[in-house]
Amino acid sequence: DVCDSLVGGRCIHNGCWCERSAPHGNCCNTSGCTARWWCPGTKFD
């Protein structure tokens, strides 16, 4: 299973690390981590 990216050694399948409390609400869209809302679809292995 190919990882889009790694954060803290964890595989992220949608390519972004999304956190509700992140300073910029960083989340995933087709351009990368630029969407300004929470995306609950982030999946870690």
Curated annotation (Swiss-Prot):
Keywords: Bromination, Disulfide bond, Hydroxylation, Ion channel impairing toxin, Neurotoxin, Secreted, Toxin. It is found in: Secreted. One of its GO terms (molecular function) is ion channel regulator activity. Disulfide bonds join 3-16, 11-28, 18-33, 27-39. The modification 4-hydroxyproline is found at residues 23, 40. Expressed by the venom duct. GO terms for cellular component: extracellular region. The modification 6'-bromotryptophan is found at residues 17, 37-38. Mu-conotoxins block voltage-gated sodium channels. This toxin reversibly blocks voltage-gated sodium channel in cephalopods, with no alteration in the voltage dependence of sodium conductance or on the kinetics of inactivation. The cysteine framework is XII (C-C-C-C-CC-C-C). This is Mu-conotoxin-like Cal 12.1.2d. The lineage of its organism: Eukaryota, Metazoa, Spiralia, Lophotrochozoa, Mollusca.
